[in-house]
Amino acid sequence: MYWLQGDDGKSVAHKLYLDPYMDLFNSEIVSFHIGQTPSAAGIQSALNEAIRVTSDCPYRRTFHSDQGWAYQMKSYTKRLKEERIFQSMSRKGNCLDNSVMENFFGLLKQEIYYGRIYHSYEELKTAIEEYIVYYNEHRIKKSLGWLSPAQYRRKHLAA
């Protein structure tokens, strides 16, 4: 959320929408879209980037999501079928099915959002973009042998 001053001089909260795609091999965010409103075009753009980035995957790809409206769009499901990507969805009302992504959102909020006030969409968008670079390149994880997601990927590609 970011805050803007309304016509009456009071601060008004505005939402920002983040649609990330995570590779579960190493928890790396491979693509994302940030917008001021939920956007089918933005989600499709992030989907296309995730497909491009993972195109050399030697195994069947599975894209998991919650049951949000965007992931049920015909254009979204058609694109997955064209690429022979299996679509997996969380059960309705069960955040545990999407716990890896929920964990990422929790870290993001804890590390750049709580206790900070953002005064514009651009300020918050930039902070999120910078955090995703930090998360991928520098934020170590115990489950990855104390490596960052990008370091873990490079280590396994070199092997």
Q: What residue ranges belong to the model's regions?
A:
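Charged DNA-binding/catalytic regions of mobile-element recombinases
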Residues: 1-159
